[in-house]
Amino acid sequence: KGLSGPAILQISNYWNEGDEITIDLLPGIDLLSVINEHKPYKTELVNVLAKFFPKRFTEKWCELNFPSIPVNRLSDKDIEMIDERLHNWKLVPKGTEGFGKAEVTKGGVDTNELSSKTMESKKIPGLYFIGEVVDVTGWLGGYNFQWAWASGFAAGQFV
């Protein structure tokens, strides 16, 4: 259905619709050596790659990028192309599943419109904004909770 997980959620903070994303699907893996180790055998490409990815992903990747043939039939140029595509996988996401399914969002009340000490609106005295309603983005891992508590505490000192 699409891509998800911590890395994709983190990238989504910076991605704009229509932007291309480049992903190294095998960081730290010398795929050229891995494929060449299987060259003496009739191991299908899909089976070599399945050691690194879920089977459905591997099958779909081969379907879209390179037919799964025995690696002993691959030329050096073929192997280099496969390596390049997996270490520099380029895609343009078609979009998201929308706000209803979002795990992260961006936007909100501009921090320049608030007192950083009190979280009070500079335009409307007595109006305070805290937590996820403020345009503050952090790394995954509970930072949104910390921001909610800290900004709530700051505002609470002045309400």
Regions found by a protein language model. Give the residues of each.
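Predominant activation on well-ordered alpha-helical scaffold segments within soluble catalytic domains
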Residues: I8, D83, H87, W149-Q157
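Short, surface-exposed, polar/charged, turn-prone segments marking secondary-structure boundaries
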Residues: L25-L26, L49-F52, E113, S121-K122, ...
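Gly/Ser/Thr-rich beta-alpha loop segments that engage phosphate groups in nucleotides
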Residues: S4-A7, V109-D110, V133, L140-N144
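Tryptophan-centered motif/residue detector
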Residues: W15, W61, W89, W147-W149
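N-terminal low-complexity, intrinsically disordered patches enriched in charged
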Residues: I11-Y14, S116-K117, S151
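A conserved FAD-binding loop/helix module that cradles the flavin
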Residues: V136-V159
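An anion/pyrophosphate-binding glycine-rich loop and adjacent beta-alpha core
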Residues: K1-K77
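A glycine-rich dinucleotide-binding beta-alpha-beta segment and adjacent secondary-structure elements
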Residues: E59-T137
